[in-house]
Amino acid sequence: MGIVDIAREYIVAWRRILTLARKPDEEEYSLLLKLNLLGFALVGGIGYLIHLGYIILTSG
């Protein structure tokens, strides 16, 4: 199997994915946005608590 065949299969696979893909509707987009913001806030809060604990433990 040559490089041309590999490239052709790759293009066919991506074309199949793009034909099955669809744009999210407004409700789905809103839900994904809320979940992403919640995840960012959760990770940021955990990072802040770890940093705060580090400051408290090393300062005294």
UniProtKB/Swiss-Prot annotation:
Q: Which GO terms describe its molecular function?
A: protein transmembrane transporter activity
Answer whether the UniProt record assigns the keyword Coiled coil to this protein: no
Q: What broad class describes the main subcellular location of this protein?
A: membrane
Transmembrane segment boundaries: 37-57
Question: What does the UniProt entry say about where the protein is found?
Answer: Cell membrane
- Is Protein transport tagged as a keyword? yes
Task: List this protein's GO terms for biological process.
Answer: intracellular protein transmembrane transport; protein secretion; protein targeting
What are the record keywords, sorted? Cell membrane, Membrane, Protein transport, Translocation, Transmembrane, Transmembrane helix, Transport
By its UniProt entry, which InterPro entries does this protein fall under? Prot_translocase_SecE_dom_sf, Translocase_Sec61-g, Translocase_SecE/Sec61-g
> Which cellular components does GO assign to this protein?
plasma membrane
User: What's this protein's family per the entry?
Assistant: Belongs to the SecE/SEC61-gamma family.
Relate the protein's function as given in its record.
Essential subunit of the Sec protein translocation channel SecYEG. Clamps together the 2 halves of SecY. May contact the channel plug during translocation.
Q: Subunit structure, briefly?
A: Component of the Sec protein translocase complex. Heterotrimer consisting of SecY (alpha), SecG (beta) and SecE (gamma) subunits. The heterotrimers can form oligomers, although 1 heterotrimer is thought to be able to translocate proteins. Interacts with the ribosome. May interact with SecDF, and other proteins may be involved.
Under the heading NCBIfam families, the entry gives: secE_euk_arch (TIGR00327)
Protein name, per record? Protein translocase subunit SecE
The organism encoding this protein is Aeropyrum pernix (strain ATCC 700893 / DSM 11879 / JCM 9820 / NBRC 100138 / K1)
Output the lineage of the source organism: Archaea, Thermoproteota, Thermoprotei, Desulfurococcales, Desulfurococcaceae
Q: Could you tell me the gene encoding this protein?
A: secE
